[in-house]
Amino acid sequence: MLRLGSLASREVRMSNDYRFGIEEEFFVVDAETKAALRRMPSGFFDALRDRLGDSITVELLQSQLEMATAPTDRIGDALDELRDLRHIAGRVAAEHGLGFIAAGTHPTASWDNVRATKANRYDGLMQDLQMLGERNMVCGLHVHVELPDPDLRVDVMRRITPYLPHFIALSTSSPFWGSRQTGLMGYRLAAYDELPRTGLPELFEDNAAYEEYVAALVGARAISDSSYVWWAIRPSQKHPTLELRAPDACTRVEDAVALAALYRSLVRFLVRHPEHHRHIGAVDRAIANENKWRAQRYGIHGSFVDLAEQRAIQVRDALDQLIALVADDAEDLGCLDALLHLRTIPDAGTSADMQIAVYQEAHHRTGNRGEALQAVKTWLAHATLQ
């Protein structure tokens, strides 16, 4: 959970240096077999809390944990803190015969073989979601950017919609599900979007319309509050932020920070250019949904539908266009180098590309699917702590 403190005065509330924070979800695994845990061992989370404080929190399922940075306006601080969180948690895990994997899905985990975390919120969720809650064996990357004005948060949420598939394509890390290669580079959202109130947000005209939607659901007792709205991007219920939730968990910490730099820069660009996507409508959202699917299916190797040109554009070309769009903002925010790291991903590959390559090499060498999947898990556990 992001640790953004309350803002004390109107002057502070109305200022904005686009502070941001990053939340990463992880699978907790057996150190030897790399299998996802069924139950959290007694004392393990307490040991993590002793070392990391409230930077680490439990998740819906006992096989998962979340680590979060403190809010900052310095991209280097976020990178250093993410590395420290991973390394410290990794050392504590090793003392308990455990490890961590950062990926959108665990390659071999069986969703029907895990247990929910005991907590009032999670008990209620499992009662409501039933089997869908059990199938929520997925891990994502969440980035908060501070926008004190609620109307501005909803305005940016609407106008950023066409760019959400870019974040999905660049972060794909979930090509396996239940010991099978899915054929998708990012299977995570296929599973996650089984839940209600997921996917792309509706195109709310302003914060009043968004609050009316939330109030209707709360009044009908469909949800308790807006934290039960799980779109790919949403106004935070607890913090004065707009929270990006579209990306898969990133195996490489540098990729996570680069995506945070892109998101922060894009938010600033949209604030500075209120006319950009001002008249976004149903067709734009429909095209964004198509591109979301294409990002899940093909990752960085596919193409997006360009609505204005009515043609396909390669993802790497769309990425170049987006980087050029926000480069000035990234430079002003001091995160241009992190942003430019994204240009290395189409050539180096995402985590999904690496997992598939490891699987294919091991399968070619051994002829055994089980050993090939084990090689993928071993690579993931190692790369997560690099």
UniProtKB/Swiss-Prot annotation:
Keywords: ATP-binding, Ligase, Nucleotide-binding. Its EC number is 6.3.2.2. The keyword Metal-binding does not apply. InterPro entries: GCL_type2/YbdK_subfam, GCS2, Gln_synth/guanido_kin_cat_dom, YbdK. GO terms for biological process: modified amino acid biosynthetic process. Gene3D superfamilies: 3.30.590.20. It is an enzyme of class 6 (ligase). It catalyses: L-cysteine + L-glutamate + ATP = gamma-L-glutamyl-L-cysteine + ADP + phosphate + H(+). ATP-dependent carboxylate-amine ligase which exhibits weak glutamate--cysteine ligase activity. Belongs to the glutamate--cysteine ligase type 2 family. YbdK subfamily. This is Putative glutamate--cysteine ligase 2. The lineage of its organism: Bacteria, Pseudomonadati, Pseudomonadota, Alphaproteobacteria, Hyphomicrobiales.
